[in-house]
């Protein structure tokens, strides 16, 4: 079993004022990386601040929404961050879903998988022009770039080969990651069975098409956890995780996870969600489902439990906790990170 890297996920509700202190805390506790998400705040600004105080941490987006931004805009942001972090950036990209792209970003939604493939190829063409000064000539199915003058070219940097990781749930994105990416962000609503039967085989197929091997692409994910110092604390933490599992399971985008296990509750949960019956939804999540999706263990054995479950299935993990985790003493976190890494 290889060493697992452990990443700190910046609280998506936190503001920029907390970015440097959170990154410093992550470094102090022994984390390998500092990741941000694009939810209620922009994902790149915290990484800029973190790069100034934690030079040893890998920095990454998990994820930034690709389609509202031109590949040119994304290429420039990533270029500057790679330079600021001395090559420690992992650019994590996601498609989001149609409702958000159309109604929240006022964008257009079409062919998300093939469009993401084109997006990544465009990024790399732009980066090549930045680094070499070669004329920019990219003609893809969705994106076309043909103008780059010296005034707008940022010029070469020391770490131009920026790793790209994409997020996804279904087979297409897993296959695409295996073919053209350096990482794949596995959604936290997953199980070992789903990894073994869907994600990893599709990634292997993609890697083979490109003449690569599976180990060329890291699998990255947050892992839902339920923990505590005793059984009472663990039991108290289960309700919130059941509710979160129910929320994901009610969404058609994640139906493939349910189908892998033969869990026939998706339609019922979707109906309850439409009615706003959130409390009842959590009660439909069985103990079997809870333990398949989440790692349930006390503090002192949680790290080993994560390693036992995932082995070489995941190369980078973060903790997805719905408990009051920031109140736990730092020594607990330090030991957990060390135990998880192995």
Regions found by a protein language model. Name each.
Residues 1-342:
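Active-site-adjacent structural elements that line small-molecule/cofactor binding pockets in enzymes
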């Amino acid at each position: 079993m290889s060493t697992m890297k452990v990443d700190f996920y910046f609280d998506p509700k936190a503001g920029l004022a907390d970015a440097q202190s959170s990154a410093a805390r992550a470094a102090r506790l022994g984390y390998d990386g500092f990741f941000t998400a694009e939810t209620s705040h922009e994902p790149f600004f915290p990484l800029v601040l973190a790069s100034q105080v934690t030079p040893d941490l890998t920095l990454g987006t998990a994820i930034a929404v690709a389609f509202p931004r031109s590949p040119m805009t994304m290429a420039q942001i990533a270029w500057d961050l790679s330079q600021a972090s001395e090559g420690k950036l992992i650019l994590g990209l996601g498609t989001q879903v149609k409702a958000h792209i159309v109604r929240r970003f006022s964008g257009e939604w079409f062919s998300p998988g093939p469009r993401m493939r084109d997006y990544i190829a465009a990024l790399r063409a732009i980066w090549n022009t930045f680094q070499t000064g070669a004329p920019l000539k990219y003609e893809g199915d969705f994106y076309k770039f043909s103008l780059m003058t010296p005034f707008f070219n940022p010029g070469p940097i020391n770490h131009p080969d920026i790793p790209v990781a994409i997020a996804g749930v279904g087979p297409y994105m897993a296959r695409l990651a295996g073919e053209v990416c350096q990482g794949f962000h596995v959604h936290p609503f997953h199980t070992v069975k789903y990894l073994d039967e869907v994600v990893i085989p599709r990634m292997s197929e993609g890697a083979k098409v490109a003449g690569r091997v599976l180990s060329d692409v890291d699998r990255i994910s947050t892992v839902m956890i339920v923990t505590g110092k005793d059984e009472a604390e663990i039991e108290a933490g289960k309700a919130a995780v059941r509710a979160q599992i129910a929320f994901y399971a009610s969404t058609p985008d994640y139906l493939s996870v349910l189908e892998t296990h033969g869990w026939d509750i998706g339609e019922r949960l979707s109906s309850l969600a439409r009615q706003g019956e959130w409390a009842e939804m959590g009660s439909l999540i069985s103990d079997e489902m809870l333990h398949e999706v989440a790692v349930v263990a006390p503090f002192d054995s949680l790290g080993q439990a994560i390693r036992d479950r995932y082995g070489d299935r995941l190369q980078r993990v973060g903790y997805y906790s719905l408990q009051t985790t920031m109140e736990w003493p730092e020594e607990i976190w330090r030991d957990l990170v060390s135990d998880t890494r192995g």
